[in-house]
Amino acid sequence: MNVGTAHSEVNPNTRVMNSRGIWLSYVLAIGLLHVVLLSIPFVSVPVVWTLTNLIHNMGMYIFLHTVKGTPFETPDQGKARLLTHWEQMDYGVQFTASRKFLTITPIVLYFLTSFYTKYDQIHFILNTVSLMSVLIPKLPQLHGVRIFGINKY
């Protein structure tokens, strides 16, 4: 029973990234994170760029690929209970504008980070591993796949 709900979606998680202004808010949040990290004294610019990239990718991995279910009481009989937010997004349709945006954003951030760290080997390895950790779960071939049973339930 959905008394008092105002949305018409069976699962509001499916359309949240298509909301008005969400992409701009997302980019501004990344910029704000970067500015906050830049304001920490005695931290160099390459370290700040790497921290921005690592924090962004860690947050993206946790919120899109680890957390399952919905924060709402949905009438879908628990179908979304075992799906991550990435799998619920756009009803599972691949290659939508929102999915492309969320795939391209860490890549652009990776390029910026690599440039501003001057391709330092340690920063480069950390940023590459971080990028792969958020890009690989986004592949269509891994939709619904739980590697080694991790995050199965």
Curated annotation (Swiss-Prot):
InterPro entries: ORMDL. The modification Hydroxyproline is found at residue 137. Residues 1-21, 64-94, 143-153 are cytoplasmic. It comes from the Eukaryota. Residues 1-17 are annotated as: Important for ceramide level-sensing. The chain crosses the membrane at residues 22-42, 43-63, 95-117, 122-142. Residues 118-121 are extracellular. Disulfide bonds: none annotated. It is found in: Endoplasmic reticulum membrane. When hydroxylated at Pro-137, ubiquitinated via 'Lys-48'-linkage, leading to proteasomal degradation. In endothelial cells, ORMDL3 proteasomal degradation is controlled by the sphingosine 1-phosphate receptor signaling pathway. It is a multi-pass membrane protein. GO terms for biological process: ceramide metabolic process; intracellular sphingolipid homeostasis; regulation of ceramide biosynthetic process; sphingolipid biosynthetic process. GO terms for cellular component: endoplasmic reticulum; endoplasmic reticulum membrane; serine palmitoyltransferase complex. Keywords: Endoplasmic reticulum, Hydroxylation, Membrane, Transmembrane, Transmembrane helix, Ubl conjugation. Ceramide-sensitive subunit of the serine palmitoyltransferase (SPT) complex, which is also composed of SPTLC1, SPTLC2/3 and SPTSSA/B. Ceramides bind to ORMDL3 N-terminus and stabilize it in a conformation that physically restricts the accessibility of the substrates to their binding sites in the serine palmitoyltransferase (SPT) complex, hence inhibiting SPT catalytic activity. In the absence of ceramides, the N-terminus is flexible and permits substrate binding, thus liberating SPT from inhibition. Belongs to the ORM family. Plays an essential role in the homeostatic regulation of sphingolipid de novo biosynthesis by modulating the activity of the serine palmitoyltransferase (SPT) in response to ceramide levels. When complexed to SPT, the binding of ceramides to its N-terminus stabilizes a conformation that block SPT substrate entry, hence preventing SPT catalytic activity. Through this mechanism, maintains ceramide levels at sufficient concentrations for the production of complex sphingolipids, but which prevents the accumulation of ceramides to levels that trigger apoptosis. This is ORM1-like protein 3. It comes from Bos taurus (Bovine). The gene is ORMDL3.
